[in-house]
């Protein structure tokens, strides 16, 4: 296929292309004008595709050296030259073998005649340093693609830390029949989810097998870690862990908390190492209930205290709804109620109600004008009491 840009006119502003003419062939790949001058790379972004002339010379020398070496090997084997189209390497626009088709392929170039063999052997010595330099330059500029393996996922830490010796029973691991320790319980795939306090969540233990013997037995240190939370580390038992089954741990109590139930106390007593008839689900449920107690309902609001009694008059009597009228018995000296009397004993204790003085019209009080000579309403009377 002909090069569509083979006879294009070069830009005239470049000093390296001052002598270019419309008839001069220009490569559409690297901008070199017939092997003369310096490459301008005007059609490439600056700084992206700008190899040096030395790199091109090294690549061309390596191509020639490898092509000659394969031709000599083919000729020495007596196979003759192959002119098949599929056995030839790809040719770039300058008629040279492509570098990517040469290493490791079966493509061959036509053998040269005996007359040119002496000249090629003489050039082998000159091209050997350039070929070595070209190989190093190609490996540096075009490194092979390596598959970056993902970093291995770190194994999770053991869910249960080993208990100190002598504190929570024996901490030795169970041994299988072949003498190897049983690592089934330490495998992260067989461990239930852990909440923030380290206890197993009961939802993950519904399908667990009943604790028995062999590899299914949890050691004492793990059982103790499941049943005892961080804030309930100290427990006291009345029977010291003696007995078996449901008879154990009935006297378990926590400092500062309410007495534990029979289920939680039984699971807590399992850290002594002899209780084997409790399932992990029951033990985890009791531990979860201890470490995460249910939210209690809000207490009933305390009723507000009764308001203070209203102050009536200058003496501050208790009953604010009375004391608006004078006590007739007190006037006669026969009232024995004292301060608890619902009427006022004098105008000093009388509670003033301005609404009671509306409607008198300024007329004199009829009770004062009568024979008894006093008014039971006192200061609250709507009539006039002699200038008051």
From Swiss-Prot:
**Pfam families in alphabetical order:** zf-CCCH
What is the recorded name of this protein?
A: Zinc finger CCCH domain-containing protein 47
Q: Where are the zinc fingers (C3H1-type)?
A: 321-348, 359-388
InterPro entries from the entry? Znf_CCCH, Znf_CCCH_sf
rRNA-binding in keyword set: no
Q: Where is the composition biased (Low complexity)?
A: 260-274
Q: Which residues cross the membrane?
A: none
Looking up SMART domains in the UniProt record yields: ZnF_C3H1
Provenance organism: Oryza sativa subsp. japonica
- Please give the Gene Ontology molecular function terms for this protein: DNA binding; zinc ion binding
The entry's keywords = DNA-binding, Metal-binding, Repeat, Zinc, Zinc-finger
Which residue stretches does the UniProt record annotate as biased composition, category Basic and acidic residues? 61-109, 181-193
Give the domain of life: Eukaryota
The ranges of region (Disordered) come to: 1-130, 144-282
Q: Which PROSITE patterns match?
A: ZF_C3H1
């Amino acid at each position: 296929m002909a090069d569509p840009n083979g006879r294009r006119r070069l830009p005239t502003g470049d000093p390296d292309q001052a002598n270019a003419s419309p008839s001069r062939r220009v490569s559409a790949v690297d901008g070199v004008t017939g092997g003369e001058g310096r490459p301008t790379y005007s059609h490439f972004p600056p700084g992206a595709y700008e190899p040096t002339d030395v790199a091109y010379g090294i690549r061309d020398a390596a191509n020639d050296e490898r092509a000659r070496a394969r031709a000599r090997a083919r000729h020495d084997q007596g196979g003759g030259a192959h002119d098949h189209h599929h056995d030839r390497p790809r040719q770039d626009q300058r008629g040279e073998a492509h570098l990517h088709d040469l290493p490791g392929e079966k493509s061959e170039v036509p053998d040269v005649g005996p007359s040119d063999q002496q000249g090629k052997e003489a050039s082998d010595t000159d091209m050997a340093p350039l070929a070595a330099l070209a190989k190093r330059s190609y490996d540096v500029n075009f490194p092979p693609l390596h598959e970056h393996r993902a970093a291995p996922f770190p194994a999770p830490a053991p869910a249960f830390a080993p208990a100190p010796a002598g504190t929570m029973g024996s901490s030795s691991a169970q041994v299988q029949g072949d003498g190897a320790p049983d690592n089934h319980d330490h495998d992260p795939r067989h461990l239930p989810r852990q909440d923030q306090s380290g206890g197993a969540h009961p939802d993950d233990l519904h399908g667990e097998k009943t604790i028995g013997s062999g590899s299914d037995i949890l050691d004492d240190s793990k059982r103790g870690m499941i049943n005892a939370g961080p804030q309930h580390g100290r427990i006291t038992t009345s029977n010291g862990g003696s007995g078996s089954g449901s008879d154990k741990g009935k006297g378990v109590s926590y400092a500062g908390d309410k007495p534990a139930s029979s289920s939680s106390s039984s699971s807590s007593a399992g850290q002594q190492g002899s209780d084997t008839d409790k399932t992990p689900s029951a033990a985890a449920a009791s531990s979860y209930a201890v470490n995460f107690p249910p939210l209690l309902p809000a207490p009933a609001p305390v009723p507000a205290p009764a308001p203070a009694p209203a102050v009536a008059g200058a003496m501050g009597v208790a009953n604010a709804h009375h004391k608006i009228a004078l006590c007739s018995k007190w006037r006669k000296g026969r009232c024995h109620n004292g301060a608890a009397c619902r009427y006022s004993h004098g105008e000093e204790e009388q509670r003033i109600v301005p609404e009671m003085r509306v409607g008198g019209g300024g007329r004199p009080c009829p009770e004062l004008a009568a024979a008894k000579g006093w008014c039971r309403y006192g200061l609250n009377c709507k009539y006039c009491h002699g200038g008051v």
